[in-house]
């Protein structure tokens, strides 16, 4: 649970349906932060407190919470239970040992240096996987980006709140990336896993901006590990670069989308030199290249479930032949974000959106985690 400072908790009157601040000096607005594998359905009901400066909240997925017979309940839905992500993790001491091991093996690696911070200080599970040689391994690639997303977790330019996973300062070489990926895939496959590594992590910019280096990495990894899943998380801004990466050996991609509508897309991403049409083209490129295509839908109650957004999202998912849809709660100060987006019609509710997607697209897998291509079927 988290306190929302400088804000008032709101409540709706049962009799009049009016909304007003809760009376009482000690009535504080709070929100829940959900564990992985759960999707936020409602925002906490609150507003700015008059007369106080509106400090921007840190980057969390603030979720409505309530008291029900003395128990805290939250407005959330289970979105995934993929065992490799939901099971028990190795101990902290084991993690520290593995980090120390890889630092000694690759003392000058920028990738190892970045992942060490992510694993130990930010508790990034994908970074930790890379040291344990299990599951999806992280390959942070780019220090630059061609967007200035309102909810960017690696670089905040104007919100006044710190990034939750500060961006890597210097981009690694192709040799660095190959060395880290190879040790991860060797260990994973020796343990009987299909092996998976991913470009594009929360602590970096846009990996497609490093096309030349990634082409070299993908080519070498595909030569060494014929059955591995080589995945990229991307904003989909450069479809031709993505096509060349598929030709080099990348066989899976996850493209993040806040909205398929250009006005809302541009308001959130603040892109430099690309549009939603380029993102759509990247999706089509993935399908044409026979790569696994996943859409990472950044959801925000009252926006994602606006009636026109619901219809457009379902239509685009159908047209693009998406294999998996990942429901992702957008981590951002709710009031701060809404002040920067176009006004939308009242939302129908995320549960109704999810049900419409299930009914309209029965073959579409839905979840929260990307699956490796070999040895793991989508739900």
Question: What are these regions, as identified by a protein language model?
Answer:
Residues 111-135:
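Short, charged low-complexity linear segments at domain edges
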Residues 136, 140, 156-180, 184-217, ...:
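Core AdoMet radical
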Residues 145, 149-152, 199:
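Short cysteine clusters
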Residues 203, 234-238, 259-261, 299-301, ...:
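Active-site-proximal loop/turn and secondary-structure-junction residues that shape catalytic pockets
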Residues 248, 289, 319-320:
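Structural motif
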Residues 270-272, 282-309:
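Conserved strand-turn element in the central/C-terminal portion of the radical SAM core barrel
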